[in-house]
């Protein structure tokens, strides 16, 4: 299959938990994307995270006033982008690993608490099929309000060819 065929090949625009677990190495308690409800190949994704009191970070952050740590919100955005790139590359016959490299312009605007449903919207700012460094813009949205936003960079690692 050549690159032109890959661009027009059938692309599944959603990802359930089983597909996410095939793409990401993360597992409980660190898998922070429940499903992806929309993807545009190599361009954007909309993930969902159902925030529950059963998550271990709420035991200490903060007793009596559980608030999702900002770093976990950013990680959920990064995982959503990894699902986007991993699924896009897999549909192009390339398995990849995606590693978080840097974060810029991060802002937290609203508390995220147990019971919230977080929409994780990520868009590719820079990156192309076969490229090793990608940059994303991410927003975590709760009840139509931006809870957090950030720009972040990821490195794509391609498996070594068999000798």
UniProtKB/Swiss-Prot annotation:
What is the reaction catalyzed? Answer: a (3R)-hydroxyacyl-[ACP] = a (2E)-enoyl-[ACP] + H2O
Cite a GO CC annotation.
Answer: cytoplasm
Q: Which residues form the active site?
A: 61
Looking up Pfam families in the UniProt record yields: FabA
Predominant cellular place of this UniProt entry's protein: cytoplasm
Keyword terms, alphabetized: Cytoplasm, Lipid A biosynthesis, Lipid biosynthesis, Lipid metabolism, Lyase
Q: Which GO terms describe its biological process?
A: fatty acid biosynthetic process; lipid A biosynthetic process
Localization terms from the record: Cytoplasm
Query: What terms describe the molecular function in GO for this protein?
Result: (3R)-hydroxyacyl-[acyl-carrier-protein] dehydratase activity
**Per its database record, what is this protein's job?**
Involved in unsaturated fatty acids biosynthesis. Catalyzes the dehydration of short chain beta-hydroxyacyl-ACPs and long chain saturated and unsaturated beta-hydroxyacyl-ACPs.
Name of protein:
3-hydroxyacyl-[acyl-carrier-protein] dehydratase FabZ
Organism this protein belongs to: Dinoroseobacter shibae (strain DSM 16493 / NCIMB 14021 / DFL 12)
* Chain's gene name: fabZ
